Amino acid sequence: MLTRNFTSLLVFLLAGVAPLRGQDQSASVVSPSTIATDRPAVTNSSVVVPAGSLQLENGFLETDSQGQSIIDGPETLVRFGVASRTELRFTAPDYYQNLNSTGGLGSGFSDFTVGVKEQLGPTRGGFDVSAILFLSFPTGAHTVSSGGYDGGAQVPWSRSLTAKWTAAGMFSLYWPTQGRTRNVTGQSTFELDRQLTGPWDVFVEYAGSFPERGGPQHLLHFGTALKLAKRHQLDFHVGVGLSSAAADHFIGVGYSFLFQGFRR
C-alpha cells in the first residue's frame, strides 16, 4: 500500500507540472555564473546546471549505525548540462571503509550510477520542480555492491518564502536489490533553508525512508554551505537518526565546483 501511494504521488506530480514547462521558465533558470548543488542535503536541487556546464560535487562522510563505524568518499556526483533544462548525471563509485574489525558492511567501492534530470518548473505557483531518473550498475565490490541493476525516480521541488527563506522537499521511489529480491522504498523529505549572507546559508531537514521490508528510517539533518566564489562551494552537515532502523548519526564535509566553459 505504501509503495502504491508513493508511485501514485510521483505520477501525479509529474503529470501536474509537465504542462507548465512553458510558463515563465526564464525566472528560474540557474545563473550561469553561480553554483547550485544537490549536496549536502538529502533533498536535491530543483534546477539543472546551465547548458554547457560541468559540475563536480564531492565529499566525505562518517556514519555510526548499529555499532558500526564507516567512512566513505569521495561521494563524487558529476552533472553535465546538455540543454537549457536537461542534465546528465554520473555518480562515481564511492569507497566505503569499515572501521570495525568484526562483522558488518565490508570495505570497497560502491556501484556506478547514470541518470538524467529534467527541469519542469517554475509553475504558476512559484514552485521550481525537476524530475530525476537513474540506474546503478553492479560494478562495485561484492561486499558493498547490491549485485543488481537498481533504478530510482526523484522529484525535488522548492519555493521561495521570503528573500531569505526557502522551503524545499523531494518525493522519491527506489528499487534496491537486497539479496535476491527488490525492497521497494519510498522516501520523502522536507527542508527549510535560511540565507544568512549572500554566499552563506544554513538548513534543517527531515528525511523519511519507508521500505516494503524493514522498519522506517527517520532522520533529522542540519547543514551549511558557503560559496567561496560563484563557482566554488564548501559544505558541512550532521544528521541524527530518529528511529531504530536509521543511522545513529553521521557527519560530513564537501567541496563542489563548476566549470562554465563549454560552448556549442
PLM region descriptions:
Residues 1-5:
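Positively charged n-region of N-terminal signal peptides that target proteins for export
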Residues 7-17:
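Bacterial N-terminal signal peptides
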Residues 18-22:
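Sec/Tat signal peptide C-region and signal peptidase I cleavage site
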Residues 23-264:
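Transmembrane beta-barrel domains of Gram-negative outer membranes and organellar outer membranes
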